A protein has these predicted regions:
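N-terminal hydrophobic/helix-forming segments and targeting peptides
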Residues: 1-162
Length: 162
């Protein structure tokens, strides 16, 4: 396998979203990449198993195990002016979240957003010294209230870009 092919596979696997609990897009991408190498199965819980070049029954087996899921956010409420209230799906280093670009995955497609928090000049001295709580963060979609209500819904998943 060439270095270019390995990089293409890595790009494909890292560009597909698979937030914890809804990993199917990542599992499907992994299964597609593994299919030319052997017999692939996706379990009901989303695990991908590939038997590569099955040999003699007494031949040694090797297991390559990796997580397919990623941490993310989930929309809990639509606020006014196109802002989305969120909860975390998995653990985040909250210090890294303010101003981070995100992608909101919806039934209507994927849309960009950015994580917003209380600006430093409006925060109390105490709040300025600690990372914001997840429940205090919003996703700025850049949409009007009406457009946001057409595009987004509670339960939509959000992934961090990059």
């Amino acid at each position: 396998m060439t270095e270019e092919r390995i990089l293409d596979m890595a790009r494909r696997l890292t560009q597909v979203h698979g937030v914890s609990g809804r990993e199917y897009p990542a599992a499907a991408a992994a299964a597609e990449l593994l299919a030319p190498m052997g017999q692939v199965e996706i379990s009901p819980l989303g695990s991908v198993c590939c038997t590569v070049c099955p040999g003699a029954p007494d031949a040694p087996h090797i297991v390559l195990e990796a997580h397919l899921d990623q941490i993310g956010l989930i929309v809990t409420h639509l606020e006014e002016n196109g802002f989305l209230r969120v909860a975390n799906v998995g653990g985040f280093d909250r210090r890294l979240l303010p101003a981070a670009p995100v992608t909101i995955h919806t039934e209507n497609g994927d849309f960009p957003g950015v994580i917003a928090s209380v600006p430093p000049h409006l925060a109390s001295d105490e709040d300025r010294e600690k990372p914001p709580k997840i429940e205090d963060l919003l996703i700025d979609t850049g949409c009007s209230t009406e457009t946001a209500r057409q595009r987004f819904a509670p339960g939509d998943l959000i992934t961090l870009d990059g």
